[in-house]
């Protein structure tokens, strides 16, 4: 009887030890699977973060005439001759510099399809912040075209050595915390979006310079029309840095064009 009891006790101990080993092995396996799962999630999370980072395009620098799309905006660098450089950044941001030029412009904006008026598109405004350093004749502005009638337009917030444009005065508009003088000029047989032809230029020129803020584009349009300066179907609205027989540089830290808001 004693021998059987000893044997039973030994067997029970072996069984319990075996169960403990099995349980520990299962626990270790569970921990391993959990660790692997956690590690896999961390790797996937890292991959997603890396992928999201890569969706932001690296800055692109161009030095000669080029048009294209970058950061959700149409862009253009144009010059007749001289040294130019434009670095395209995320969104509406860009930087530029120029020297020994005849005429050069750097811009980002929105192109339309010449089928709607500004009223049909909805309210248009531009928000921007720029470090602008011109040396000579230059201006910082909203720029664009309409068709039918063909009109080239400028809303100038800052300039270099010369305050444009020296045309026919059409009055003023007070908007966005400042007074703008309104002018109209005529260009005869000059380059345009429709080739060399004759067309009107409309200008709003701020009396006091600034290099950041909001430009309520549609309010300028309405003021022009109230003064007998009709606009046609929208072709383009852009934020523009332009130089003429000058040098300079500009860093457009941020720029956005809001339509229908």
Swiss-Prot record:
Residues 1-28 form the signal peptide. The keyword Transit peptide does not apply. Pathway: Glycan degradation; xylan degradation. Disulfide bonds: none annotated. Pfam families: Glyco_hydro_11 (PF00457). One of its GO terms (biological process) is xylan catabolic process. It catalyses: Endohydrolysis of (1->4)-beta-D-xylosidic linkages in xylans. Belongs to the glycosyl hydrolase 11 (cellulase G) family. This is Endo-1,4-beta-xylanase. The gene is xynB.
